[in-house]
């Protein structure tokens, strides 16, 4: 399925991506750091637009390939079965000027890259072709999480 997301045009195999995430493990199940513990609940409560955006790509929002930072200000990535058709960004210039912002009311921005040499850790058995969606997120402090 073709998605036009700001400067990016991506071709995603939504079903293969969903199939992978169905058996993937959430960050809070494998890591005890504050960011990994906080992220799954924070992402689900930050914005229905963000959750729908990720779900439409076949991604389980609670299962990033990596998440790091502190619990309210974190970065990471999700992997998607797909290709980047248009919108490549040079290394080192991923900032808000070339990011896609799914919901302008929430501080959650993403970039897409298909260069395996620049990708972070890739989950075991992730199907090809691999597209990496990096993100930066700032969540409000939640006392109940």
Tell what function each PLM region has:
Residues 1-44:
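Long, hydrophobic N-terminal alpha-helical segment
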Residues 34, 81, 134-136:
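Residues in well-ordered beta-strands of folded domains
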Residues 38, 85-87, 140-144:
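Generic "edge-of-domain/loop-turn" microfeature
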Residues 43, 90, 143:
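Short acidic, gly/pro-rich beta-turn/loop elements at beta-sheet edges
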